[in-house]
Design a protein with these regions (language model features):
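Polytopic membrane enzymes that build or remodel cell-surface glycoconjugates and lipids
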Residues: 2-487, 500, 504-511
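C-terminal luminal/periplasmic domains and tails of membrane-associated envelope-modifying transferases
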Residues: 2-10, 424-620
């Protein structure tokens, strides 16, 4: 097949070609991260969520908070549903002995596929809104715009947090369904556009920003009247209303937003207005820096990574503010001469403003994943700048420059994927870029504790104490190290302090429950185990709580707990033994014998089971 034949085939099947190219390049560039472990928020949000692994709970996810705790104020049920499906597939195809790296692979493969589809939709939207002209030189120029934006978006290293980090799927899905909503909107299928908008909102709250983009396309690009555009977009009130109702059902009093953010997650929330605005523009500068030169990437920017701006003459504030003003000018005053640039400015500003902390503080000060949607607008602006260079210099130089950028982005992305290999790798890399990050310090210390590297853990604690002592995580780590040194009084003091700072600190609850159980203070242990399973119903702690209730001669509570959290399927040697023990203490020897015998058949040969079985038989 000659070159002319290939070109002819691609020309006649261009969208299919771009879709295949998107999938191939996405796996080529992000594929080296597929077999990374669950890291950071992946562990609590995805890996250890029992409600995501239970098929009978699937539809309940659509009225459940993103985290177990309503007060966190997050509602992303469609994203949770896709995690659940990943778990179901893992259970069906992977052996029980599979490693966490193997279990995580399917989740990341899905993320890569969604990113490929998103990149394809970027190509489609740019091509649709700014199609090639009939004149061959102009046609080449306009094709360049869509291909350049597509390739820059697909390869940009700032997207590793959204693609390689499993919890980044919320960004990916919100972007996907938002662009699908735009597709059906321009095709005048309002019903499917509304459904797509609802799916986008159910993926992540930031999808609300697609509404001004839809309005802009109808009003400015298609030149409909303001009144006609308003009437056309008002129909989207229905999917928004459905979303609000479901969100209220899931979050109750917290449906308007987060109530748990501390100074550690977002210091901006605790600054006065002028300092918050100035520092927020500094953060915009930092985003801009990473979009232009994505070398210094970090998984965490929380306290005390970003110092507050003390003066409006601070260069980082000035650059961020000037960039913001430029985008606003381009959007409102540049659209007559630079329609492409104006659209790029809108696509950056609409999602950015929702996470910028300029309008109101959000749950975090900064996160690279939050740039997933805004980066489309920025990269469209970059492509537009290169596009304009066609008028100034030989196009071969423009193509060479674009090729160099894409190669650089691709290599940097592949290198960055390796940082997410496992928890130690990730937090070590994070602290190299953000040495004052309290969250990263605590996370690395937790890895040290898991690996019995106690000297290193204590070193991280001492650094953390100098950053910010009055933090729940810091106090919890202090208690863990004290307990390791057999100073149980200090351990108890620090874990209680951790809970004073954050009553929902599940790790401190677990540690106190374990301490009290070890000391024989079973009633107090039971209180904390109950708090744990109310928020974090992992089988291990359900069993611990139930055995605590049995030891307190409260078998009915143990049986109720087993039925509520573990269901009727007790086809597990430890769970059936637990049920048998509860019925034995209750004096229901028939039920006790049934479950104890089942436990033995499943392989639990503990001598206590045999003893209880003999007593049960003697009482029948």
């Amino acid at each position: 097949m000659g070159n002319s034949t290939v070109r002819h085939f691609i020309k006649n099947n261009e969208f299919a070609f771009v879709l295949v190219l998107a999938v191939v390049l996405s796996f080529a560039i992000f594929g080296n991260g597929i077999f990374n472990d669950f890291t950071f928020d992946d562990v609590s949000v995805v890996q250890n969520r029992g409600d995501l692994k239970d098929p009978s709970n699937f539809f309940n996810l659509f009225i459940s908070p993103y985290h177990h705790l309503e007060k966190i104020g997050l509602f992303r049920p469609l994203t949770m549903a896709t995690y659940a499906i990943n778990h179901y597939i893992n259970d069906a195809v992977l052996p029980a002995s599979s490693s966490s790296f193997q279990q995580a692979a399917g989740f990341r493969a899905v993320n890569i596929i969604i990113h490929a589809l998103n990149s394809f939709l970027v190509f489609w939207l740019v091509r649709y809104l700014f199609p090639p002209k009939a004149d061959p030189p102009l046609a080449d120029k306009n094709k360049f715009l869509s291909y350049a934006t597509f390739l820059l978006f697909l390869t940009h290293p700032i997207h590793t947090e959204a693609v390689t980090s499993i919890v980044g799927r919320a960004e990916l899905l919100a972007f996907f369904w938002s662009l699908v909503a735009i597709y059906f909107f321009v095709k005048k299928d309002i019903l499917l556009s509304s459904v797509s908008l609802l799916f986008a909102l159910l993926s992540k709250e930031v999808a609300l920003m697609v509404l001004p983009i839809l309005f802009y396309i109808s009003w400015i690009h298609f030149k409909n009247s303001f009144l006609a555009t308003t009437r056309r977009t008002l129909v989207f009130a229905l999917p928004v209303l459905v979303y609000v109702i479901l969100r209220y059902k899931a979050l109750g009093a917290y449906f308007l937003g987060d109530a748990t953010t501390t100074i550690v997650e977002n210091p901006l929330k605790f600054m006065d207005w002028s300092e918050r605005i100035a520092t927020a523009f500094k953060v915009l500068y930092m985003y801009l820096e990473r979009l232009v030169w994505p070398i210094h990437l970090s998984a965490d920017y929380s306290y005390n990574t970003i110092l507050p701006v003390q003066s409006f003459l601070d260069p980082t504030f000035l650059v961020g503010a000037i960039f913001f003003v430029f985008l606003v000018w381009l959007l409102f005053f540049g659209r007559m001469r630079h329609l492409i640039g104006a659209f790029g400015a809108l696509v950056f500003l609409a999602p950015y403003l929702m996470v910028s902390n300029l309008i109101q503080p959000v749950g975090t000060i900064m996160g690279e994943r939050l740039m997933y949607f805004p980066s489309f607008g920025f990269l469209l602006l970059v492509s537009y700048a290169l596009y304009k260079l066609f008028e100034k210099i030989n196009k071969k130089f423009v193509y060479a420059g674009l090729t160099a950028i894409i190669i650089f982005f691709s290599i940097r992305t592949m290198i960055r994927n390796n940082d997410w290999h496992d928890a130690r790798t990730l937090f070590t890399a994070t602290l190299e870029e953000s040495p004052n990050s309290l969250i990263a310090r605590m996370a690395l210390a937790a890895v040290d504790v898991t690996e019995n590297k106690w000297d290193s853990a204590e070193e991280q604690l001492n650094i953390a104490l100098n950053i910010y002592e009055d933090n729940s995580r810091v106090q919890n780590l202090w208690g863990i190290i004290a307990d390791h040194k057999n100073d149980q009084d200090l351990a108890e003091e620090k874990w209680l302090r951790s809970l004073e700072l954050n009553p929902d600190a599940v790790n401190a609850q677990i540690n106190l429950a374990e301490l009290y159980a070890k000391q024989g203070r079973l009633k107090e242990a039971g209180v904390y185990f109950k708090q744990v399973i109310d928020f974090y119903p992992v089988t291990e702690y359900v069993i611990r709580y139930a055995y605590t209730q049995i030891a307190l001669n409260n078998p009915d509570e143990a049986i109720k707990t087993i039925e509520y959290y573990l269901g009727d399927d007790l086809n597990h040697p430890d769970i059936s033994a637990l049920a048998g023990t509860a019925y034995f203490v209750k004096g229901d020897y028939k039920q006790a014998l049934f479950y104890l015998k089942l436990a033995q058949e499943l392989g639990n040969m503990a001598k206590e089971i045999e003893e209880m079985m003999q007593i049960s038989k003697g009482n029948l």
